A protein has these predicted regions:
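Conserved Rossmann-fold NAD(P)-dependent oxidoreductase catalytic core, especially the SDR/UDP-sugar
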Residues: 1-34
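Glycine/proline-rich active-site loop of Rossmann-fold NAD(P)-dependent oxidoreductases
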Residues: 17, 53-55, 66-75, 110-120
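Active-site Tyr-X1-5-Lys
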Residues: 30-60
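Glycine-rich "substrate-gating" loop/helix at the edge of Rossmann-like oxidoreductase active sites
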Residues: 32-36, 63-70, 90-100
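Alpha-helical substrate-binding/gating segment
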Residues: 77-85, 93-127
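Mid/C-terminal beta-alpha module of Rossmann-like enzyme folds, strongest
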Residues: 110-160
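C-terminal amphipathic/interface module of NAD(P)-dependent oxidoreductases
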Residues: 163-189
Length: 189
């Protein structure tokens, strides 16, 4: 093939308790050291032989994908429907996200444009905090964002994976911006 896209995640950079714990990270940001970062790093290393064969390799580091058809957004909608919505954890963690339509268009651009090579962060240009996200979701649904989901509740529901629900990344789409990608959904609103 002319191009190989290896689907990775922004977990590559590690997870942080709150947005102020890190600066914005583009594709040149350092590797993280937590478990999820190690998985992403190993996953990306496994794809590197494709480049040695002369194939254009893109390591697509995707953030939280928003869609009403599934995933995090759908899980957050249910509590808000019953006036029980609010931020997960402290609410101060960063949420580097992308709308499903932008994710699809990003992949199409990568397939069609040879300027994309190496790491590409598939995230919207403006990371938000979990508090911002919950407030915006409440506004869209006409519901208050009052009831935070405590870390303990997340741990009971998710077990070991809870750490990644109450922490976040502050990533930006450096490669997409450089190549003029047009986001349909650049901000939460």
């Amino acid at each position: 093939p002319g191009v190989f896209i290896s689907a990775s995640a922004i977990g590559y950079y590690g997870s942080f308790e709150q947005c102020s714990d890190t600066s914005e990270l583009d594709e040149s940001g350092p590797e993280g050291r937590d478990f999820l970062a190690k998985i992403c790093i190993d996953w990306e290393k496994a794809a590197l032989p494709a480049a040695d064969l002369g194939v254009r390799l893109v390591l697509l580091r995707t953030g939280i994908v928003f869609s009403t058809k599934g995933g995090m957004l759908q899980k957050m909608i249910a509590p808000f429907s019953f006036f029980l919505g609010g931020p997960v954890g402290s609410g101060r963690q960063c949420l580097s996200w992308i709308h499903l339509d932008d994710e699809i268009n990003c992949i199409i651009d990568i397939l069609d444009d040879s300027r994309y090579s190496g790491a590409v962060n598939a995230v919207a240009p403006l990371p938000a905090t979990m508090n911002d996200f919950a407030r915006e979701l409440g506004k869209v649904m006409g519901r208050p964002s009052l009831v935070p989901v405590p870390k303990l509740a997340v741990q009971l529901l998710m077990g070991e994976g809870a750490e990644y629900a109450v922490k976040g990344q502050r990533d930006i789409p450096g490669a997409l911006k450089r190549n003029g990608f047009g986001f349909r959904y650049p901000v939460l609103a």
